[in-house]
């Protein structure tokens, strides 16, 4: 069994000696968590995607009551997204460097690092040789893609669970990061950042920003993009989603990239939306971001001022300037 040599780590993560690893299940105190394909399922049955319920042969009458704040559409969308775009691409490495520019990676060597909302594990993939242990958690079936992408990484523990209901002990992680996740939750994103403090003393969080430092055209286009997102995010048809991501990439993103390339001659490319973020990216990578951008029903944006308001909880706040 994959977790046989990880018993001590699991005891430390859950903060109890009462941990047993049994065939296809993990027992912690009085709680039992199924294990499917090396992924420990922390959620209650009412939060299970259909495929998980079927694998566990659960009947509807045995499922627990609906959980308040549970966003099934977000679970569906991100599970669908990462199964549609499961690959870790070469350009992800450059993105990794941008997201982690505030982190001294050398300091992670003997640390336990937690990736909350890990998706396909694309950031953990570049950390697997830089830390002692990785803990990956996602709310969707993308966690199984992450397991496959890190199949040769024996220092990793995989959980499927709800970020807001973690059964882990306080300060279980030396470093915790959550990239592009909390702004999609149905609860206040900044409050969720505050709630994560108990799990690690050092956090790296990426949230959508309210375009404080962007030119006027960015702010002008955002309301139109939001209207489109609210409409198309309700459509779950896979053919529609595939065609929409292709259309969006070819007829919205790439034209803006081309316009930005032309404006580079005059030093004005920074004023063109999408150019800086997507210039040089592959069509596949752009389509994945179109999916991410337009098929999520919930999108929160925060200002620099509101981020600095987190000083009511944290001793130090550092805001990155690269993204």
Regions found by a protein language model. Give the residues of each.
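A short SAM/SAH-binding and catalytic strip from SAM-dependent methyltransferases
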Residues: 175-187
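Conserved class I S-adenosyl-L-methionine
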Residues: 202-234, 240-243
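A short glycine-rich, Lys/Arg-flanked "PGG" loop and its adjoining helix->strand segment in the class I
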Residues: 190-202
């Amino acid at each position: 069994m994959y977790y046989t040599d990880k018993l001590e780590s699991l005891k430390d993560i859950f903060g109890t000696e009462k941990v047993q690893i049994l065939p296809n299940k993990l027992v912690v105190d009085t709680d039992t968590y199924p294990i499917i394909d090396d992924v420990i399922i922390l959620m209650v049955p009412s939060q299970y995607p259909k495929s998980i319920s079927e694998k566990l042969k659960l009947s509807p009458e045995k499922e627990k009551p609906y959980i308040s704040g549970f966003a099934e559409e977000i679970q569906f969308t991100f599970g669908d997204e990462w199964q549609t775009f499961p690959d870790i691409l070469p350009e992800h490495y450059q993105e990794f460097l941008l997201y982690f520019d505030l982190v001294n990676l050398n300091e992670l060597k003997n640390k336990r690092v937690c990736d909350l909302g890990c998706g396909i594990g694309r950031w953990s993939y570049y950390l697997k040789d830089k830390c002692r242990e990785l803990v990956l958690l996602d709310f969707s079936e993308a966690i199984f893609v992450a397991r496959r992408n890190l199949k040769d990484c024996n220092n990793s523990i995989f959980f499927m669970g709800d970020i807001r209901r973690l059964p882990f002990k306080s300060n279980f992680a030396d470093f915790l990061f959550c990239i592009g996740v909390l702004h999609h939750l149905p609860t206040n994103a900044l409050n969720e950042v505050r709630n994560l403090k108990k799990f690690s003393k050092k956090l790296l969080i990426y949230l959508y920003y309210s375009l404080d430092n962007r030119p006027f055209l960015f702010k002008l286009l955002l309301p139109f993009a939001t209207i489109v997102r609210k409409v198309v995010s309700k459509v779950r048809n896979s053919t529609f989603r595939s065609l929409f991501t292709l259309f969006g990439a070819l007829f919205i993103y790439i034209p803006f990239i081309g316009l930005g390339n032309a404006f580079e001659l005059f030093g004005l490319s920074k004023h063109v939306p999408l150019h800086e973020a997507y210039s040089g990216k592959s069509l596949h990578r752009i389509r994945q971001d179109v999916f991410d951008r337009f098929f999520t029903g919930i999108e929160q944006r925060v200002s620099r001022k509101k981020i600095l308001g987190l000083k009511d909880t944290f001793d130090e706040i550092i805001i990155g300037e690269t993204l």
